[in-house]
Amino acid sequence: MLVLGIESSCDETGLALYDTQRGLLAHALYSQVKMHEEYGGVVPELASRDHIRRAIPLLEQVFSESGVAHGAIDAIAYTQGPGLAGALLVGASVACGLGLALDKPVLGIHHLEGHLLSPLLASEPPEFPFIALLVSGGHTQLMRVDGIGQYTMLGETLDDAAGEAFDKSAKLLGLGYPGGPAISRMAEFGDPTAYKLPRPMLHSKNLDFSFSGLKTAVLTVVKNQTTNICEQDKANIARAFVDAIVEVLTAKCVTALKHTGLKRLVIAGGVGANQQLRESLNAAAAKKHFKVFYPELEFCTDNGAMIAFAGAMRLQINPDAAKKDYAFNVKPRWPLDSIREI
């Protein structure tokens, strides 16, 4: 089965072709980071307009690179939600328009399911069941995954997501956009003993997260500086911030594995690319005797490959999941634990 995947939920336009026999045939991605940089964040209207400009050239690129004819695809999977409404509509319109033109069925995919399954694209994918930490700019969730569509929520953020805390704290330190990579790079030069920031909900009796207080703590430290913050102070604060986030995420993952008795941990989402987090989880895995799986770095960010793959997995379970129904039906808000209804 050959599936075309289309991702357009936020500020990356991604297209990919995935074949259940041959694997990932081609994928192409365009990031709008440079365009949004001057605004300090994603501008939804600009994002939507840029998806329109990029989608068709990227579509032609993946067909050209794969050597596959347009009519050879069996289905089209697109990100149906959650995400920015206008951005989602662009991907949906491309999918439905192409499906109508080629007489191919289409299937809406949950963006977070795409992230959740992206580590399965690796050469040594994890087996079910496993614990998944989904950690990105908009979401921080711990889930038990027993199979495709079999997701049990164990814990989630009660306020800011980890990635959101990264971006906002980076802005407080004047590190620019995107904040996550910037604050992580700065943290590498920081003194881990210079500042001590709180570890929100580290010792709570559940698996939920809360990062708004950590962001506020960074703001307090910045405001308490009597002079302009020098680069070393920024690095020290960044280090304290990253250490706090990483410690909480690692501890919650270890607790989830202990409570469920599982020995496999999957990390998905953009924050999963953070080197400090990977080092911490790898150390915990060696100490606690579990195995941790990550997506390839190129698949940590939003991408079309994960959508094509998720679509292919869905269709293997239920070949009738894709329909020749070309009405747009995007879901800007869409809880992950409801997608088994697809």
UniProtKB/Swiss-Prot annotation:
Cofactor dependency: Fe(2+)
Reactions the enzyme catalyzes: L-threonylcarbamoyladenylate + adenosine(37) in tRNA = N(6)-L-threonylcarbamoyladenosine(37) in tRNA + AMP + H(+)
Keyword field: Acyltransferase, Cytoplasm, Iron, Metal-binding, Transferase, tRNA processing
Gene Ontology biological-process annotations: tRNA threonylcarbamoyladenosine modification
Residues the record lists as binding substrate: L134, V135, S136, G137, G138, D167, G180, N274
GO MF annotation terms: iron ion binding; N(6)-L-threonylcarbamoyladenine synthase activity
GO annotations of cellular component type: cytoplasm
Top-rank lineage group of the source organism: Bacteria
Cell compartment(s), UniProt: Cytoplasm
Family annotation (InterPro entries): ATPase_NBD, Gcp-like_dom, KAE1/TsaD, Peptidase_M22_CS, TsaD
Keyword Cytoplasm: yes
Keyword field contains DNA-binding: no
Residue spans crossing the bilayer: none
EC number: 2.3.1.234
UniProt remark on cofactor binding: Binds 1 Fe(2+) ion per subunit.
Positions bound to Fe cation: H111, H115, D302
Functional summary from the UniProt entry: Required for the formation of a threonylcarbamoyl group on adenosine at position 37 (t(6)A37) in tRNAs that read codons beginning with adenine. Is involved in the transfer of the threonylcarbamoyl moiety of threonylcarbamoyl-AMP (TC-AMP) to the N6 group of A37, together with TsaE and TsaB. TsaD likely plays a direct catalytic role in this reaction.
Family label: Belongs to the KAE1 / TsaD family.
NCBIfam families: gcp_kae1 (TIGR00329), T6A_TsaD_YgjD (TIGR03723)
The name this protein goes by in its record: tRNA N6-adenosine threonylcarbamoyltransferase
Organism: Herminiimonas arsenicoxydans
